[in-house]
Amino acid sequence: MTEKLVLAYSGGLDTSVAIPWLKEKGYDVIAVVLNVGQHGKDMVAIQEKALKVGASQSIVIDAQAEFADQYVAPVIKANMLYEGEYPMVSALSRPLIIKKLVDIAHENEAVAIAHGSTGHGNDQVRFEAAIHALDPDMKIEAPIRDFQWSREEEIEYAQQHDVPVPINLESPYSIDENLWGRANEAGILENPWHQAPEDAYALTTAIENTPDIPEFVDVTFTAGIPTALDGNEMPLADLIIKLNIMAGTHGIGRIDHIENRLVGIKSREIYEAPAAAVLMTAHKDLEDLTLERDVAHFKPMVEQQLANLVYEAKWVSPLFDSLMAFVDETQKNVNGVVKMKLFKGSAIAVARQSEHNSLYDEDLATYTSASSFDQAAAVGFIKLWTLSNTVYEQVNHVHSQKPSQLKLKN
């Protein structure tokens, strides 16, 4: 009896050539496509393509709502940006994809799961680390990596096996996309001195072609999660889709940077994340209004560690769960509205309010005669605040002269 295998299928070149290759190894291939918000993708066409190139089954799952609510929401609450820039576009969808693949593998009594990652990238680690965590006995196939195909060899193999080739050698972009953004690499983008051409972008307008009039949008947050735009409540997935269009029109969310991959190499990456740019900026601004100072100062350390964990394939880990428990606790009072200005590639918070959780007291902050701040209390506070440093300096004279030195000068 032929053994069954579940393939993470995207419709692209890598996973399309994987199907005939896996069949040649003796597998009955079940192709699984997860709709996590790929822009402009025809899921029916992708499903049919998998069958055409040799899959015995082709399954499409609409996971947009689950992706937004269970995976994007934690990233927003934790302000996760890998190396301060990358909002986890590709890294974020992998844990959900693997969860679904493992479930389908169990339902169909499949013995193996396959992915189309290369040996150069992070995804091979993300896919396989999650599979090992969820089912250590599951076999893993990675034909592109294991066969060490180059892009040219893949295309040649595809042509030999009647697999449609969606790209050409002159523009061999490798694109991954979901609700949260779009990642583009390979081809001419591999030269870090080469400016990315406009055809490398799809979600954002070039700055010179953006509107000359700014657009404003009010983003409402409830417990740290975006719940409404301009007062209109909507599911998070719909909110992200709408913001991607609004912010993308103004050229917001383009990221062109050198990234430290977890496999040890540096990579030039082009990302587009319009909604992420707006929501992350708005969320941080509301936190500035509602979080107590010590929490606000400590949380960024947790955020950085969480971003590293997600990037490094450790979404399924006790440390991730523990740190997210802290983040969830901090978000209970992150309720309010932030007014965002969208203009010429920038998303700027220009106003904010939190009816019940704002820690901003205008009576204390004002410099007018209406101030309720007790300035007389400052003298004693300053003496106590600096007492330990004052005593240390008097004893050790690290930054001041000793009394004996002063006498010599006189």
Swiss-Prot record:
This is Argininosuccinate synthase. InterPro entries: Arginosuc_syn_C, Arginosuc_syn_N, Arginosuc_synth, Arginosuc_synth_CS, Arginosuc_synth_type_1_subfam, AS_cat/multimer_dom_body, Rossmann-like_a/b/a_fold. L-citrulline binds at Y86, N122, R126, S174, E259, Y271. It catalyses: L-citrulline + L-aspartate + ATP = 2-(N(omega)-L-arginino)succinate + AMP + diphosphate + H(+). The gene is argG. L-aspartate binds at T118, N122, D123. GO terms for biological process: argininosuccinate metabolic process; L-arginine biosynthetic process; urea cycle. One of its GO terms (cellular component) is cytoplasm. Its main location: cytoplasm. Keywords: Amino-acid biosynthesis, Arginine biosynthesis, ATP-binding, Cytoplasm, Ligase, Nucleotide-binding. Belongs to the argininosuccinate synthase family. Type 1 subfamily. Its EC number is 6.3.4.5. It comes from Leuconostoc citreum (strain KM20).
